[in-house]
Amino acid sequence: VSELVDKLFGVHDALEGASLPHAFGGAIALAYCVEEPRGTRDLDVNIFCDASDAATALAALPDGIEVADADVVAVERDGQKRLFWDGVPIDVFMNNLPLHEAVSGAVVWVQLEGRQIPVLDCASLAVFKALFGRTKDWADLEAIAVATPEDIETAVHTLAELVGEDDPAYERLVSVAASRPP
């Protein structure tokens, strides 16, 4: 088992022990949405409680994760913050939009190294990736469109409701959906 998977299990066990609903996103969730997963060196974890509860949620993380008072303030303000655990980036996301409530209800449980873990469903992951809009996100979205085109279609509809059909992220996701091979 790799260091990253050990840390993932540590985060999962800590949050589950604190009865905090959560799911892993990023490349971990992506691995269950595409035909050819890509590597990663960080963990993305969505903790499904209001960002105003950041102090409680961040205190529940494993002891090795460095959390300063300024990190709590950042999560309360922005709904997200990159933390570190022995040099491994742990990107924490908390609820600060109505979308997060819907996402929490769509979490799927998958097998990883003989254990069950919660991950974002592919359509929700696609919405977040379109909103982030980094180059690697668009490559990931193209891969999702090939493997599970229905999830890209769902993401297109969700994104239209969130940002409108004149938003560049929406327009680009429509293009990804339209250009997938048959």
Question: Residue ranges of each PLM-predicted region?
Answer:
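Compositionally biased terminal segments of proteins
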Residues: 1-182
